[in-house]
Structure formats: C-alpha cells, structure tokens
Amino acid sequence: MLDWVGGALGFAYVPPSPYGIFMRPAYFGLTGGNYGQNRTLVHEAGHYCGLFHTFQSTSSCGTETNCNAQGDRVCDTPPTTGNFGCPSNGGACDNDLVNNYMDYTYDTCMDSFTQGQTLRMLSSLETSRPGVVTP
C-alpha cells in the first residue's frame, strides 16, 4: 500500500535511488482540471531522469553563484521561487520559465524542458538507468 505524502499528485525517485514513478490514479491520463493533462506524469518522469524542481533549494530571485550546485543544478534554468497556477505576469521572478515541466504551474502552462534539462536527463539515463534506453 502506498502512503501518499500530503497532497502529492505523484512522485518519482531520482537517480541513484530505487527506480519508480508513482501517480495518483485521479491524475493519470486525460482527466480534466488543472492537473489532468498528463503533465504531472511528464514532471515525475523528469525527476526519474535526474531533474529537480526549477525552484529547488531557492527562496529568492537572483543570480546563482554556482549553477551546477545550486537551484535545480541546470545552468540554463534561471533561479525561481516556484510558480503555481498560470501566472500571466511571467511569474515571481523576472526571468521565470513558467512553462517548464519542472515547475508547479497548471498543466495548460507546461510545455517544455530546457536544453540543459534535456541533456541532464539523457546523461542520467545513460549512467544511472542504462537498461531504460538502448542504442
């Protein structure tokens, strides 16, 4: 039996933790609502492939001194405090990527990973989850 933490819609283990993505059935598939367009599954797959939230370990806007060790640890995603809903003003920080799958915006707003996130996922799959991708 899975014991859900708080109001989580799903969760995934990041490498090198045990494999797995878990989803609440109500948020799997095209179920309607703010989080019912399968973007939660894409978000959790991002975690499974080594990504963190765009707002990971960040409590303010600004510049990271070491983008490989701070925030989401991907240099082409700017620091953010995290977004909810579909912010029409571009988010809490001036350069927020409110459309990023690794934020908490509504599914209708999410539509992309950055190039750096894509490279991190590919690297993670090759090194930490080699059985998932075959040449």
What are the roles of these predicted feature ranges?
Residues 1-42, 48-135:
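Extracellular (secreted or membrane-anchored) zinc-dependent metallopeptidases
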